[in-house]
Each structure stands twice: as structure tokens, then as C-alpha cells.
Amino acid sequence: MASTDEPGVGSGDPTARARQAEAIVNHAEHSISEDAIVAAARERAVDIGAGAVSPAVGALLCVLAKLTGARAVVEVGTGAGVSGLWLLSGMREDGVLTTIDVEPEHQRIAKQAFSEAGVGPGRTRLISGRAQEVLTRLADESYDLVFIDAAPADQPHFVTEGVRLLRPGGAIVVHRAALGGRAGDATAKDSEVAAVREAARLIAEDDRLTPVLIPLGDGLLAAARD
């Protein structure tokens, strides 16, 4: 049968497919505009070295919060509040974001961002402490969405706890699931890669979860719970 693929598109040329995939991701990453409040929070994140999700990742978090009808969300890694602002924008008006960070200064700056956005104090619960300890104190099946943006080495523990927290119909999202492509490199054997792969395995082997790996930011591993 004659192929209808255009030159360099589809299943023909692996190099062309790779270029096309890169162009699509680049387009997606630059297709989202942020308002002045989120942009200011992003600048503060740079100033304090906190890191922040890309606008495209933020927009996806907003969409997932809307799709799950999220009233209760847990975020591991407050940073300067960029991802929190995106999550809050998609949550229900009576929703509460619980956000955890070991750095009190990060949370102080995030609180400023939330205030600038007009987010009432009753809609956020900022917990300063080690997420490894804080998560264990949160109630089972009490959250609609769990977002993990933390050190790759801690992903397996956070995934285990995050899935425990999810209500049926909820979703878990893990950022930094690709490690710049290293997670998919069969020759990469370092401890970070091993931890990220273990987190992915835990999600893949849980029959209650339907996972997908999304090529935005540094890779998002998302899963919906039945």
C-alpha cells in the first residue's frame, strides 16, 4: 500500500519525527500567557532560587483542578507560589489548597502572591515542614488532586502517600518525571533516575490508577484514580 505520509512526517524518518516532536512541545510551552500576578511570582521564584513550573505546566494544573472539581488539593513544594496560583485558579471557589514546603521564606513569599491574587486566607493552608512527615498526618482519601514538585529522590515516598490521600476520581501529578530525558535513557543508572523510575513503577502497578506521561516542563507523570 502506498504511504500517504508527508516527507519527514509520521513513521518515515526518526530524525524528522524527533524534530517534529520537539517543535510541538516547544509550541505548547510557549502557547500560554500569564497574568501580571503570576509573572511577578515567577520573578520572585528566580530571585530566591525556588524554581517554578512552566506556564504550560501551570495551565495543565488549572485544567486538572477544573476537571476533578477540586475542593481539596495538596501541593508538595510551595516555592514562590506559581503552581499554587495556577491550582487555585482551577479549583472551586470554596476549595482549599494545602501547600507544604520546608523553607518558611518560600511560604512567606507565596503568601504574598496569594494575597496579591485576592485569594482569601481561608483558601490556603501553608504548612512549613518536611513533606515526608507532614503527608503522613493527612487523612486518607480526603483530596481531589495531589501535586508533587520536589526532589526526585523523594518521589517514591511522596507517590505512596499521595495515592493514599486521593479520593476516588481524583488525580496525582508528579513533576520532574523525565529528568531532562534521563529517565528514559536505558544507560542512566544514577540514584535520581532510579527513584523516578520507582515512582513511575508504583503508579503503573496500582490497578486503581490510569497513568499518562506528559512532555511538558521536566515531564509530568499524571494518573487518575478510579
UniProtKB/Swiss-Prot annotation:
Gene3D superfamilies documented for this protein: Vaccinia Virus protein VP39 (3.40.50.150)
Classification via SUPFAM superfamilies: S-adenosyl-L-methionine-dependent methyltransferases
Xref: Pfam families: Methyltransf_3
EC number: 2.1.1.-
Top-level taxon: Bacteria
InterPro entries in the record: Cation-dep_OMT (IPR050362), SAM-dependent_MTases_sf (IPR029063), SAM_O-MeTrfase (IPR002935)
Annotated positions binding substrate: 149
UniProtKB keywords: Methyltransferase, S-adenosyl-L-methionine, Transferase
Name the UniProt record assigns to this protein: Putative O-methyltransferase Mvan_4497
Species in which this protein is naturally found: Mycolicibacterium vanbaalenii (strain DSM 7251 / JCM 13017 / BCRC 16820 / KCTC 9966 / NRRL B-24157 / PYR-1) (Mycobacterium vanbaalenii)
Lineage: Bacteria, Bacillati, Actinomycetota, Actinomycetes, Mycobacteriales
